[in-house]
A protein has these predicted regions:
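Active-site-proximal alpha-helix that buttresses catalytic centers in soluble enzyme cores
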Residues: 6-198
Length: 198
């Protein structure tokens, strides 16, 4: 992953955490070459992205802020091929499916700043992310949302977040094209992180 020096962005964040949901970490891997599995390779085959761009964003935030990382991992995994997953993901959304997680959800009572990352599926957050926000109260936190998308941007996700969390204040938001190269994604996202420290 890319190496980025610490910056003024880390100042003023207080106790911070990066919580994220990444597709490549929530798939059935039986019979797959695990080293080849990423949100990029699973979706599109080997190419210009070594890892999914959401993980690029997570890595850059961690390097520049020193925040604790907490990945959300579900017990019932998705299909490993992206196109096999998307129809089921729509059914999950329409039926308000309730996922369970491999680990207890994080205690953020002493956290000042939350960076939260996820993909955008069907113009919304994945259902496991919705389930997370149904259970963990973000009121009073400095909340920054980052995502990857395939043309929708953050669509109506911020409004959806506010429906799930009436006490939530979104301090900043950013969405990257999931199909960018890792290099261009890192350059673009770093520029956004720079703006947070100004």
């Amino acid at each position: 992953m890319m190496s980025v020096p610490l910056s003024a962005m880390a100042e003023g964040l207080g106790n911070s955490i990066i919580i994220y949901f990444d597709y490549s970490e929530n798939i059935v891997t039986d019979g797959l070459d695990v080293d080849a599995v990423s949100s990029a390779s699973v979706a599109e085959g080997p190419g210009v992205r070594e890892i999914g761009n959401l993980l690029v964003m997570v890595d850059l935030i961690e390097q520049r802020s020193g925040a604790t990382i907490y990945p959300l991992r579900i017990t019932e995994k998705y299909a490993p091929m992206y196109m096999d997953m998307v129809d089921g993901a729509l059914e999950d959304k329409e039926n308000d499916r309730q996922f369970t997680f491999e680990q207890p959800l994080p205690d953020i009572s002493d956290v000042d700043t939350v960076f939260f990352g996820s993909p955008i599926w069907w113009y919304d957050m994945p259902q496991p992310v919705v389930n997370f926000f149904q259970q963990v109260d973000m009121s009073g936190k400095r909340f920054m949302y980052f995502s990857i998308n395939r043309g929708s941007g953050n669509s109506g996700v911020i409004e959806r977040l506010k429906e799930l969390q009436p006490g939530l204040t979104v301090a900043a938001e950013y969405s990257l094209d999931a199909m960018q190269t890792n290099e261009s994604a890192a350059e673009e996202f770093n520029a956004w992180l720079d703006s947070l420290g100004k």
